[in-house]
Regions:
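Long, hydrophobic/aromatic N-terminal blocks
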Residues: 2-45
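Short acidic-glycine-tyrosine-enriched beta hairpin
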Residues: 25, 91-112
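Tight coil/turn sites that cap or link beta-strands
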Residues: 60-63, 104, 112, 122
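Short beta-strand His + acidic residue motifs that chelate non-heme Fe in jelly-roll/DSBH
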Residues: 67-68, 87-89, 109, 115-121, ...
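Short, conserved beta-strand element in jelly-roll/cupin
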Residues: 56-61, 70-91, 130
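Double-stranded beta-helix
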Residues: 116-178
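Hydrophobic small-molecule pocket/channel-lining residues, especially in calycin-type beta-barrels
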Residues: 45, 63-64, 71, 85-86, ...
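A short glycine-rich, His/Asp/Glu-containing loop-to-beta-strand
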Residues: 28-68, 74
Length: 178
């Protein structure tokens, strides 16, 4: 059967223009150095009308991630592809939940869910991070202009960049004095 033989109508094939599919081969993609972290951009939103963005991150052993934060306008998903990444999930009472996501584990962080991550191990960690909408990829591009390769990113540098992308720090409850 060729395309001229396809019936068009409800429940039938719908004609569409050709829309190219994008492949980012392994080891390709825009590389952003974020101090000690490497970010490889897989989708910047330019092919998805900014509906989704994706990047692969590589964290060295023992690295703490950004300050605990939450996003006002975008959801994130994380797929661990190498090692173990630790998610710190601050709670209003000052405690936190911990998730250790191993290779193959998938974590979803909805809008307004407080979180951060770290690599508590002595092994390199890799994960793929998606965000919807895709505009958040620009946070990493901006952060890359703030920091020098090989130096850790300061909390102030993280927070300055986050403030441009509807991302707010978590207010930590201080322990009560006795």
């Amino acid at each position: 059967m060729d395309d001229d033989d396809v019936e068009v109508g409800p429940g039938r094939a719908i004609p569409t223009d050709y829309i190219p599919v994008n492949l980012v081969p392994a080891k390709n993609g825009e590389i952003i150095k974020l101090g000690l972290i490497t970010c490889r951009v897989l989708e910047d939103g330019s092919r998805t009308d900014n509906r989704i963005g994706a990047a692969e991150f590589t964290l060295p052993p023992g690295l703490s991630g950004p300050p605990a934060h939450w996003h006002e306008m975008h959801d994130e998903c994380f797929l661990t592809t190498q090692g173990v990444i630790r998610y710190h999930l601050p709670k209003a009472d000052g405690t936190e939940d911990i998730i250790d996501a191993k290779e193959g584990d998938f974590v979803t962080v909805p809008v307004r869910a407080p979180h951060t991550f770290s690599n508590p191990t002595d092994q390199e960690v890799k994960f793929v991070n998606t965000f919807t909408p895709a505009h958040y990829i620009n946070y990493f591009k901006l952060l890359g202009t703030y920091v020098k390769e090989g130096k850790p990113i300061s909390p102030k540098e993280h927070l300055d960049a986050m403030s441009n992308y509807a991302t707010l720090p978590v207010l930590r409850k201080k322990a009560e004095k006795k």
